[in-house]
Amino acid sequence: MKEFSSPADASNWLKEGKILIHPTEGVWGLGCNASNISACKKISNLKKRSDNKNFILLAPSISCALELSAELEVSQIEFLESVWPGHVTVIMQANNSLSQSLKAGDNTIAIRVSDHLPITNLLNSFNGLMVSTSANISNFPTSNSLDEVKKIFDDPDVAVYAHDNGGALKPSSIIDLKTMEYIRE
């Protein structure tokens, strides 16, 4: 399996429509170019996951994430600025410019602005959105072992962005911005 340490090399892999095992703040992620529908479907197939289950979007900056949202109240923007960058995914209403394939049926997106330097560097080099999901088979536990993840997703279209995960040992918290309720803590 190919491994990249350079954000530019990993970014080029994503631009080719390929899949990347990547570090996050917590568990290993599986990601691709958010605008490449066939790459998104490939991730669903690799994970044995339903096509109608949406992915988390990773944005390179708070301003990029805000550009994807429907109109927000000042208090909502202040909340986002207080949790991002960070290990928090937020569900919010999407604007109309975003592809319907990235939105849930209720026109929402799940989005995060990471504070983990390797993923931030990758997103800045890529200069776009990635979809991301935990690197495990659907409904099975996540693994913190890169070797195990590489065995599970051994495929010629999958490579590794070889940097360490952050210190969190679990997936990100998920908060619904409309209700301010935790979906996952």
Question: For each of these PLM feature ranges, what is it?
Answer:
Residues 1-185:
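Active-site-adjacent structural elements in enzyme catalytic cores
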